């Protein structure tokens, strides 16, 4: 069975590690955890490095623990933050925890010998009293030690509340609790979590005289220098209600050539050899972008499932060429309807409207005069066929699957009409 550290290093997924981790992994599989902040009801692609690390841990024989911060979520981690986060209610956090667990099921198995486990740190943090916490945790850390952490130093000028200042002690207590209760010996997280992770290892060492380990992932930025996972529209979410599967697919498909090798290593389970073969194919015919297509299909299928991915891929082909519209299913056209301008008409309305009326209705033309000029220049089409006259009408037999008609202006402007 592959060694976890070797697997992660081969994919450039390790930024830092505590001494002795390699020796510990050589002894056999390990139980490890990653913490997730439950301030939203969905993970986003910025969380996927952590999620993939848990998946690799399980593939290498280890037992992954997902710690959802129901307790720490009520405090707020200052790491990488310029201001204090809003405090959520217990009810909000519980709803978010349930939603996040459902998303993680796409990546790790909750069945079998080394089944993944979900833990909410509120279960143990709510049970400990202040005096007990100060006695059992606080006495093991000096204020100087806590002030030296980058997550704290970065906030000293702007101000940091005692609530956030104490966060590293609470996360340290998580690590100690999991070590005691579940023999968890590894915590993983982003590079900004290094201070919190080492605080936990320090607490375990001081209280139990044992060695536990930490591993962090690199900060992921794109070749253009922007933070990975951010678009003009904001974060790219795993929840289809927040980011549609089509937009999710397009996010990965639009990966810069300079980033695609790294993202294939980070976010797929393709072997290093398979990735090299994809890149060689891409070098022979860059226009087809096989590496980006495989990346987009692989990640979308894992997050949204293979059926949704097939519909999304087909919808993408409709807009960018390479498919027969008549063969498109109603599901595929429904995906498109959520991504391009659309209008719904009744059968009676369709019979009364010309194609020019429909083009104006969906916003592809400002007026019938614009349609006439566009038709003269062969600039409009209906279901892939160049429009010869704006006065034509769409018959029932002209409709695509599901009662759709696809209108097009130029090469890249589309709209759908749905007949109900």
Curated annotation (Swiss-Prot):
The keyword Nucleotide-binding applies. GO terms for biological process: tyrosyl-tRNA aminoacylation. PROSITE patterns: AA_TRNA_LIGASE_I, S4. GO terms for molecular function: ATP binding; RNA binding; tyrosine-tRNA ligase activity. Its EC number is 6.1.1.1. It catalyses: tRNA(Tyr) + L-tyrosine + ATP = L-tyrosyl-tRNA(Tyr) + AMP + diphosphate + H(+). Coiled coil: none annotated. Signal peptide: none annotated. NCBIfam families: tyrS (TIGR00234). L-tyrosine binds at residues 33, 167, 171. A motif ('HIGH' region) lies at residues 38-47. It is found in: Cytoplasm. Keywords: Aminoacyl-tRNA synthetase, ATP-binding, Cytoplasm, Ligase, Nucleotide-binding, Protein biosynthesis, RNA-binding. It comes from Anaeromyxobacter dehalogenans (strain 2CP-1 / ATCC BAA-258). It comes from the Bacteria. GO terms for cellular component: cytosol. This is Tyrosine--tRNA ligase. Homodimer. Belongs to the class-I aminoacyl-tRNA synthetase family. TyrS type 1 subfamily.
């Amino acid at each position: 069975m592959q060694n976890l550290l070797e697997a992660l290093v081969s994919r450039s997924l390790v930024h830092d590690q505590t001494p002795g981790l390699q020796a510990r992994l050589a002894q056999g599989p390990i139980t490890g955890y990653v913490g997730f902040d439950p301030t939203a009801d969905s993970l986003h692609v910025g969380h996927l490095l952590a999620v993939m690390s848990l998946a690799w841990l399980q593939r290498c024989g280890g037992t992954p623990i997902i710690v959802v911060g129901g307790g720490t979520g009520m405090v707020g981690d200052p790491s990488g933050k310029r201001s204090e986060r809003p405090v959520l209610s217990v009810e909000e956090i519980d709803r978010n925890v349930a939603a996040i667990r459902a998303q993680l099921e796409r990546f790790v198995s909750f069945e079998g010998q080394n089944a993944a486990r979900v833990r909410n740190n509120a279960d143990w943090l709510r049970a400990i009293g202040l005096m007990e916490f100060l006695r059992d945790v606080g006495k093991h850390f000096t204020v100087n030690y806590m002030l030296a952490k980058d997550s704290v130093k970065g906030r000293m000028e702007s101000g940091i509340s005692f609530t956030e200042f104490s966060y590293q002690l609470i996360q340290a207590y998580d690590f100690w609790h999991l070590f005691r209760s579940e023999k968890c010996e590894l915590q993983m997280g982003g590079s900004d979590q290094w201070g919190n992770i080492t605080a936990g290892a320090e607490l375990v060492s001081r209280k139990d005289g044992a060695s536990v380990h930490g591993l962090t992932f690199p900060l992921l930025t794109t070749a253009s220098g922007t933070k990975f996972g951010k678009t003009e529209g904001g974060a790219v979410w795993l929840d289809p209600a927040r980011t549609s599967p089509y937009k999710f697919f397009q996010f990965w498909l639009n990966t810069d050539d300079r980033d695609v090798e790294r993202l294939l290593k980070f976010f797929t389970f393709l072997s290093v050899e398979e990735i090299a073969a994809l890149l060689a194919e891409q070098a022979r015919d860059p226009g087809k972008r096989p590496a980006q297509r495989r990346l987009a299909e692989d990640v979308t299928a894992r997050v949204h499932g293979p059926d949704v991915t097939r519909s999304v891929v087909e919808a993408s082909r409709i807009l960018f060429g390479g498919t027969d519209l008549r063969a498109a299913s109603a599901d595929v056209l429904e995906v498109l309807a959520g991504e391009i301008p659309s209008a719904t008409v009744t059968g009676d309305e369709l019979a009364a409207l010309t194609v020019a009326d429909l083009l104006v209705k969906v916003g592809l033309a400002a007026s019938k005069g614009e349609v006439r000029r566009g038709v003269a220049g062969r600039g409009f089409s209906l279901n892939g066929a160049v429009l010869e006259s704006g006065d034509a009408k769409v018959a029932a037999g002209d409709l695509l699957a599901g009662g759709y008609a696809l209108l097009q202006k130029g090469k890249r402007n589309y709209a759908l009409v749905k007949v109900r």
